[in-house]
Swiss-Prot record:
Origin organism lineage: Bacteria, Pseudomonadati, Pseudomonadota, Alphaproteobacteria, Hyphomicrobiales
Biological process terms in GO annotation: tRNA modification
Binding site for ATP: 19-26
Record key words, sorted: ATP-binding, Magnesium, Nucleotide-binding, Transferase, tRNA processing
Record's function text: Catalyzes the transfer of a dimethylallyl group onto the adenine at position 37 in tRNAs that read codons beginning with uridine, leading to the formation of N6-(dimethylallyl)adenosine (i(6)A).
Amino acids binding substrate: 21-26
The protein's name in its UniProt record: tRNA dimethylallyltransferase
Enzyme's top EC category: transferase
Location of the region described as Interaction with substrate tRNA in the Swiss-Prot/TrEMBL record: 44-47
Species this protein is from: Methylorubrum extorquens (strain CM4 / NCIMB 13688) (Methylobacterium extorquens)
Catalytic activity: adenosine(37) in tRNA + dimethylallyl diphosphate = N(6)-dimethylallyladenosine(37) in tRNA + diphosphate
SUPFAM superfamilies: P-loop containing nucleoside triphosphate hydrolases (SSF52540)
Membrane-crossing segments per the record: none
Amino acid sequence: MQSPDGQETGRPAAILIAGPTASGKSALGLRIARAFGGTVINTDSMQVYADLRVLSARPTAEEEGLAPHRLYGSIDGAVNFSVGHFQRQAAALLSEMDAGTLPVFVGGTGLYFRSLDEGISDLPEVPDAIRQRIRAEADGQPTETLHAALALRDPESAQGLRPSDRMRVMRALEIHAATGRSIGSFHDARVPGPLAGKPLLKLFLTTEREALRQRIDARFVTMMEQGALDEVAALRERRLDPLLPVMRAHGVPGLTAYLDGTISREEAIQRGQGDTRRYAKRQFTWFRHQMGEDWRWTTPEAAWSQVEARLSAPAGR
């Protein structure tokens, strides 16, 4: 059922909590799960990795013990975990959950949230042998050179990509090598989301920008005190592909450079803080322009009142 302003008013099948990094999403999700018998489900592309508890700001072991948490820290850093992988895991988890359990999806990755409701393009899996061959050929080449190579093989994809966007250029090259088709040719075929058509409460947590920037900077310093450098040192020892998501997480490149001796510790911290602030800005922009009007922009304090109101409503009303 909807209110006169078009918002759902009945009890939701799931709660979706998004927002910029350091906005209080995890704390709100845990509070909801404890109060209403819910399970907190990770919806953040970095918090899936076992290697990054500290740098991804994953819930602590103590917090995870207060309510069920799923899809956190379950993936090895060597895996190129995609939105398709997330959607399949989330769908499987939802099918296994008891009927009375409230799913509480928490995170900052917009495409993950979109995959739950609107679905995603049905992109094919790229065999490891092809991915490794393409990346070996690309090693040491400027991204602009790779973009030019893509333009020769797949002009349609190249036209829609910035010549400096190495990750997406590489993805287009891999898809074309594996299928002989443009990556854009797969966009019309969609995999429906596991929450499509269900009543949902979608909350985007917002806060005053300067306060958020200060929290981001302070949190990165705290991460350093909690072992962020040890996490990066362990990743560095594994010599993983620098294009893997885990190697591009905020803080990893700068701290790797510090361990390599090319920048100072203070410069590494400043780089991590700056990268995270810019990411938060992109999160605001992306959700504002890419997600539907059914997302409620709210403060963490006001969000709790909205949750209480919706969860106290009888189902179907």
